[in-house]
Amino acid sequence: MEEALRAMLRAVPAVSGLVATRVDWGIAPQGQVLPCLTLTVVSDAPVDHSLDGPGLSQARVQVDCWAATYAQAKALSRAVRTALDAWQGGVIAGAFLASARDLPDDDGVTEIHRVTMDFIINYHFG
């Protein structure tokens, strides 16, 4: 699922036009150019009651859209939402937006803007 999600986001022109290949699981590399995306698995569990048969899992994936300005972060979040909401393909049985929030990330040194979205990802495990 992780590989498929990252590859899909990098392949969508509306997303890659803003971040190129700057889509990373966990944390962005030190000194990462903005804008960029980080992806985090918040939870992941098998779905035992699936009509799709064994091997279906459901993950909550947090997608953080980082940018130098709020407008850039919001534009990136809209591109990601358009790409991911209701997407299915390959191992991904379905992806759906669960929540979104705007969060500043002010460490006192640099001002970075962030829009965070949680997606429910149903996928075929294994």
Segments (PLM) and residue ranges:
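Acidic-leaning, charged glycine-interspersed low-complexity segments
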Residues: 82-126
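Short beta-strand or tight-loop elements
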Residues: 35, 59, 101-102
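Small/polar-rich, solvent-exposed N-terminal microdomains that initiate assembly or binding
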Residues: 1-53, 71, 75, 82, ...
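Residues in well-ordered beta-strands of folded domains
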Residues: 24-26, 38-40, 64, 98, ...
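Oligomerization/assembly interface segments of phage tail-like spikes and tubes
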Residues: 55-68, 73, 113-123
